[in-house]
Design a protein with these regions (language model features):
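Active-site acidic/histidine proton-transfer and metal-coordination neighborhood
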Residues: 1-53
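Generic low-polarity alpha-helical segments
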Residues: 29-31, 59, 88
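Histidine-acidic metal/acid-base catalytic patches
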Residues: 42, 47-52, 61-194
Length: 194
């Protein structure tokens, strides 16, 4: 609910605290926050280029309907955000839900998350200094807080759609694949500049 001036003061406070205490602080791409939509986030990044981001892209993917209106155009628009990601929340959503069971990595929208994560990782690798780190943390939340979906089983009982532990392992594998691809892209870009 913050207007742009209030949000800028929050961003400045985050940047000041991070510098003063030597602790990396990341602003999350999350609904109902100052970085809830791609337009506003990119504008704030332009105004505050030192911001570093926690990319929880499932909120944008579902809330901003990333599958409609040209996914690659949206990727290009959010490039300034992807350049600043230093923490990734590993959750995959679809056009209708922020957190879904992705099976064994076969759902069609997974490719979009692979692209978001790979590009974020590639930017990190190109900019990283010795000792820098990028966190990838699966974040699969409970139906009790309206993230994990529930459906009735054959007996009529409500059951959570997925096993969050198993899904975390799938997300971890996807992230590892993305990191390997990002390393290849980063290495070839650096080699091309040499």
């Amino acid at each position: 609910m913050e207007d742009d001036d209030e949000a800028s003061r929050i961003i400045e406070a985050v940047l000041d605290s991070s510098a003063r205490f030597g602790i990396p602080l990341y602003i999350e791409t999350h609904r109902a926050t100052i970085f809830q939509d791609i337009w506003r986030t990119v504008q704030f990044i332009r105004k505050h280029p030192d911001v570093r981001v926690n990319g929880d892209f499932s909120h944008w993917y579902t809330g901003q309907e990333f599958v409609y209106g040209g996914f690659e155009a949206k990727m290009q628009f959010i490039e300034p955000v992807l350049e600043r990601v230093r923490f990734l929340h590993g959750r995959i959503g679809n056009p209708g839900s922020i957190q879904v069971d992705i099976g064994e990595d076969e759902a069609p929208y997974i490719g979009h998350f692979r692209a978001l994560w790979t590009r974020s990782m590639e930017h990190f690798l190109r900019q990283a200094s010795p000792g820098d780190f990028l966190c990838f943390v699966p974040e699969l939340l409970s139906p009790r807080i309206y993230y994990g979906r529930v459906f009735r089983d054959a007996g009529g009982e409500l059951r959570e759609e997925s096993d969050r532990w198993t899904q975390s392992l799938v997300l971890r594998k996807i992230a590892q694949d993305c990191f390997v691809k990002a390393q290849t892209l980063s290495d070839s870009a650096i080699g091309g500049r040499a």
